[in-house]
Amino acid sequence: MLDSEIYKFQYRRRRGLRRIYDVTINIVQLESGVFAYESWVHFAHEFKGNGLVFPLVAKTSTQAADEARARIEDHIENLVGLDE
């Protein structure tokens, strides 16, 4: 059975329009032990994208959450896989 955790937070972009985005991240630990994630980014209830999604290198769920959050924050800053 897969173990899944949902995290929600807001992130303010530091450049461009400096909007505050609502972010949802779903982190799952696969049966192999590898962590993966999917993210959804919204602004004013409008879907802006998922960013790019790759497997995580983290070994614990806490590390996976931190790694996924850092990745999506970087994607928001650089508009990678997202619309402003």
Task: Outline where the language-model segments fall.
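Negatively charged, low-complexity tracts enriched in Asp/Glu with abundant Ser/Thr
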Residues: M1-T24, E46-K48, E84
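Broad hydrophobic/π-residue packing in well-ordered secondary structure
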Residues: E5, G16, G33-E38, V53, ...
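Hydrophobic beta-strand residues in large extracellular and virion-surface proteins
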Residues: Y7-F9, V23-I27, Y37-S39, A64, ...
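A short, structured beta-strand/loop element
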Residues: V23-L52
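Mixed-charge, Lys/Arg-enriched low-complexity segments
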Residues: H45-E84
